[in-house]
Amino acid sequence: MANVVVVGAQWGDEGKGKIVDWLSERADVIARFQGGHNAGHTLVIDGKVYKLSLLPSGIVRPGKLSVIGNGVVLDPWHLVGEIAKLRGEGVEITPDNLMIAENAVLILPLHGELDRARESHNAVAKIGTTGRGIGPAYEDKVGRRAIRVADLADEATLALRVDRLMVHHDALRRGLGIEPIDREALLAQLREIAPQVLPYAKPVWKVMNEMRKAGKRILFEGAQGALLDIDFGTYPFVTSSNVIAGQAATGTGIGPGAIGFVLGIVKAYTTRVGEGPFPAELKDADGERLGERGREFGTVTGRKRRCGWFDAVLVRQTCATSGVSGIALTKLDVLDGFETLKICVGYDLDGERLDHLPIAADQQARCTPIYEELEGWSESTAGARSWADLPGAAVKYVRRIEELIQCPVALLSTSPERDDTILVTDPFED
């Protein structure tokens, strides 16, 4: 029985929420394996809209186990708030259907303060962070000074962890002109939140492996997109974690052999939030039209997304680094009505044609797109549920994308509604 990893194959915001919800109906376990509460996802179920940023998408479905793995950095106050919000919307959340890795790292208020202070001091070279403390929390994890979920259970250990953290952070805060950490206030905050978090804490690696051996279907839910990966993204304009599919194993404690199918989520055009290179970006009327029709505003930040034509070079690259088995192509309906469509098929860098995005940031910034033009269509694709419902030009567009990215389409999404999906390959089938 195949276990499935879902990853964004662009810069995030590809429409993962709908696809994950569609798959989660048949999964037994839905696990998040990286990131924090910086990347939101929107679910539309029976006309009701749910906006999540930390909890796995499966939490809104009864009878599913939702898991927050050790690869996630966890803001405990945001967690408690998101749980309360969903409970207010009629969603049942208990330790029976939500599990948090004991070794997941906590995001503390000091992480957000540091994140925002750095961004304000770097006026010339902003990264485009959400300011929620994700990056600083990962820094503490790698620096071996982080506070983890399990530390909340022992007050003596917690105090030692806070003292170790303060040595590092107070030095940083002095340099940035921030007041020193109030040790007692931080400890009081952690003592207060601990009993609201600890009931969900479990040895996730152990439970996940038991589930696998029992033949349960596991869905690994990625956040953000592979082009924001700390190693393979447009560094330094990236997130602070690995986003590619291999992180699903590391971020939950299950072996890579457990992964059967990697589904890359790909928008039929390209968007990006925040700073960083974007070779196929459109700063004209076509770009505005894509943004308006696609409602391209961030779920968490509300920031307007930059829009551009489909970049086959980048998606081919992310399909390779994540070992994508098939893609889910979303938002095809946004392209309805364009007379001519363009696909980026290569880059020009100082007169040389490239078939990949170079790793150096200065070279990325100098890349200009090489386009191939395709005929558009005037008919509507919204709500199509079979290939026969699509205009011929739309089918040609999809087929050309498959050829250029060297990866087949497994699913085609034609609206935010979960049933408006054309299934080609079921990722859960053996």
From Swiss-Prot:
Is GTP-binding tagged as a keyword?
yes
Keyword list, A-Z:
Cytoplasm, GTP-binding, Ligase, Magnesium, Metal-binding, Nucleotide-binding, Purine biosynthesis
GO (cellular component) term, any one? cytoplasm
Q: What is its EC number?
A: 6.3.4.4
What are the required cofactors? Mg(2+)
Binding-site residues for substrate, renumbered to this chain: T299, V300, T301, G302, R303, K304, R305
Fill in the subunit field for this protein. Answer: Homodimer.
HAMAP family of this UniProt entry?
Adenylosucc_synth
Q: What is this protein called?
A: Adenylosuccinate synthetase
- What is the organism field in this record? Cereibacter sphaeroides (strain ATCC 17025 / ATH 2.4.3) (Rhodobacter sphaeroides)
Q: Which gene encodes it?
A: purA
